[in-house]
Amino acid sequence: MAESDWDTVTVLRKKGPSAAQAKSKQAVLAAQRRGEDVETSKKWAAGQNKQHFITKNTAKLDRETEELHHDRVPLEVGKVIQQGRQSKGMTQKDLATKINEKPQVIADYESGRAIPNNQVMGKIERAIGLKLRGKDIGKPLETGPKGK
């Protein structure tokens, strides 16, 4: 009992592995062998410049039993985008540059493969001057003064 006094502190544990070592494949396998809980998660869209995320609730899709897919842009809207773009003499690349999107986004919207995003739809509407949402699809866009 002589060595346990109030001024000394005894630490009985080792320093854990650093973050880089803990992420290695070797460390993960060793932890699994010891029976410890190991959580792995995959990085999504790492290294890419993803501006627009899919805003639909994915948990809602998980609970859904029948149709497990998002609504796509109707072909009618794709045709309106294509006609409006061609009437202004723009290529898909020109339109994409004008609205600060990638040409692939425009191609997806025109072919009906894209999941509708109101922000992108609004930019395309203003660029080609035609309505793409609501009941008057294909009608000219009314540009009035903004009121507060």
From Swiss-Prot:
Which InterPro entries does this UniProt record tie to the protein? Cro/C1-type_HTH, Lambda_DNA-bd_dom_sf, MBF1_N
Name a single GO cellular component.
Answer: nucleus
- DNA-binding region of this protein: 92-111
Q: Where is the HTH cro/C1-type domain?
A: 81-135
Q: Which cysteines bridge via disulfide bonds?
A: none
Q: Name one Pfam family in it.
A: MBF1
Disordered: annotated segments: 1-26
Q: Which GO terms describe its molecular function?
A: DNA binding
* Coiled coil (residue ranges): none
Keyword DNA-binding belongs to the record: yes
The cross-references to CDD domains, in alphabetical order and at most eight, read: HTH_XRE (cd00093)
Stretch forming the signal peptide: none
Which UniProt keywords are present, listed alphabetically? Activator, DNA-binding, Nucleus, Transcription, Transcription regulation
Task: From the Swiss-Prot or TrEMBL record, state where the protein is found.
Answer: Nucleus
Q: What is its main location?
A: nucleus
Query: What the protein does?
Result: Probable transcriptional coactivator.
- The protein depicted here goes by the name Endothelial differentiation-related factor 1 homolog
